[in-house]
């Protein structure tokens, strides 16, 4: 997917992801996921739908405060902190709510202060009505993509390798329902 950086008048970097005219719904889906995500994480990475140089796409503020090992691709679930597990539960609620089943380990990033952010919700609503809310559901397997990190984490919990508090998930569901 095409991506490019833009700098705003304040010197902040933004990642622009243009989409083809037939795929404008993807950009709108990303912004919708951000707006819903703010209900449970006011610090969610800002995403907007925008037209730049005649091209529609989504644009998100670029994070500059990330840890050196900023994503979870090399993090086994048993090495997660309890705070990371709780934040991953929060992002799981959002991704299931918007039917985004592409939340693999590279789409969860962590800041130096320990905050976990879910990014790249470009598949939001893609499988809505056809999806299966199961930790075994992995529709992007056919594309050779990693499974959603949530599947990996919750399978580790099922196997007794990590612990998580279901009340955390319930709290985030209730926050969205308000």
Where are these regions (language model features)?
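A short, charged
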Residues: 44-47, 102-103, 107, 155, ...
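C-terminal catalytic region of ATP-dependent kinase domains
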Residues: 111, 115-178
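Conserved aromatic-histidine-acidic binding/catalytic patches
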Residues: 21, 25, 80-81, 85, ...
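Charged, low-complexity surface segments at secondary-structure and domain boundaries
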Residues: 73-78, 158-159
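Conserved kinase catalytic-core segment
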Residues: 34, 39-42, 76-131
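Charged, low-complexity, helix-prone segments enriched in Lys/Glu/Asp/Gln
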Residues: 26, 92, 172-176
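Poly-acidic low-complexity segments
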Residues: 2, 84, 98, 163-165, ...
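Conserved ATP-binding subdomain of kinase catalytic cores across diverse folds
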Residues: 1-71, 95, 99-100
């Amino acid at each position: 997917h095409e991506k490019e950086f833009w700098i705003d008048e304040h010197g902040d970097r933004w990642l622009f992801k243009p989409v083809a005219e037939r795929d404008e719904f993807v950009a709108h889906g990303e912004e919708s996921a951000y707006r819903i995500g703010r209900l449970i994480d006011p610090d969610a990475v800002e995403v907007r739908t925008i037209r730049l140089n005649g091209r529609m796409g989504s644009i998100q503020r670029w994070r500059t405060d990330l840890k050196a090992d900023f994503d979870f691709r090399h993090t086994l679930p048993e090495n997660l902190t309890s705070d990371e597990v709780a934040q991953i539960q929060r992002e799981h609620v959002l991704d299931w709510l918007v039917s985004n089943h592409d939340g693999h380990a590279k789409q969860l990033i962590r800041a130096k202060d320990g905050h976990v952010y879910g990014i790249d919700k470009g598949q939001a609503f893609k499988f809505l009505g056809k999806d299966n809310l199961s930790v075994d559901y992995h529709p992007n397997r056919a594309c050779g993509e990693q499974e959603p990190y949530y599947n990996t984490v919750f399978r580790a919990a099922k196997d007794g390798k990590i612990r998580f508090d279901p009340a955390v998930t319930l709290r985030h569901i209730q926050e969205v329902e308000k």
